Amino acid sequence: MSVSSVLAVSCGRGRTVDADIIPYVGYILSDTTSVEHSILDGYRQDRFGTIAVMGPAENTERLTAYLMKCDLFDNVDGKVMKDGLPDFAGETFAAYYDTVNVPYQDFFINGNEEALRGLTVRHSVAALDSRCYEGTYSREASVEKSPSKIVIFSSPFSEAGIADADSLFSMSGVGPILISPVKSLVDKVIRKYDEGAMIGIWAESDVLSSGVFASAFRDCSSDGRRAADYVGFSPDMNNRMKDCLIHYLEMFLDSGNEMPLSAILIDDFSYPYDKNALSSAVDHIRNSTDDKIAKYRTLLSDDFEVIGCMDAIAESCYRVLRRKNLFTHRIAYPQAVEYMITGTPGQGGEIKYVELSQKYVHQ
């Protein structure tokens, strides 16, 4: 069934585009001559499709590299246990480096959130296309590429447009699975912790002020799922990890909170996330005899843990591939292809998805 047919059936049953969804979604669904409509019409989810990672170049490069080598699960039974093999063996990642729309936080700062939501939808649809541009100045998309079965966003700010993209794919009846840092972190918390648990969010101040975390927790509550209490801070990152954690806990105390933290969610791609350094920092607080440190000990619950966004994203991706039987089952190291999201001077500011010549394999 074509996208047009699905739209007609949906409207016939009284379903219309949600008033909260941006007009761009309605345009794609209704304009049969649009490029986006054509892409959706020709898309079929395939287990041999790529796993797209899209967003600012630095975040995307770091996240793609991590996903290619991470080993969190036993690939035979899916248990949380290292098995010495890459979790995404046999998979191909498609890294899309956005160089023209960054920094994403400027959309919020300038009060132009709708444009960012539209960009998220546009990127999602582009990942499904079977063609891309050979170069920045190419007039036509003539290079073949593999459509994606999953789209992972590497920026927390993209969360603002996830609902729009989800609505588009739901109404059209086709589309990839969408994964984001914020949703991955919040979903992990909702699965693991009871209502009333205190969760700390560690993120850049622009992320916290954008409201993407507040929206994600609110959506969980509206879905009828239990939601933990949460509070967010942005500690100074120009110190040792131990000092950063203490600074975070000091901010937590200064806000009037005394309830022990069950977990801290780290959603920050601007610095290397070091599990060992954080683990050592937690051990230092738990075991220190220094009276100045002792006051922080009571802020950490017995099962306190730190959850990083890259681990949460990897878990979300792995579980959905396993649940929906979308693994390729190829016996090979993960590999990646790369694309540049760029603009073309003199061509109306058109955004293009350009193939890069590099292709690499994790060894």
List PLM regions with ranges.
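Bacterial N-terminal signal peptides
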Residues: M1-V6
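Non-catalytic structural scaffold of enzyme domains
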Residues: A8-Q363
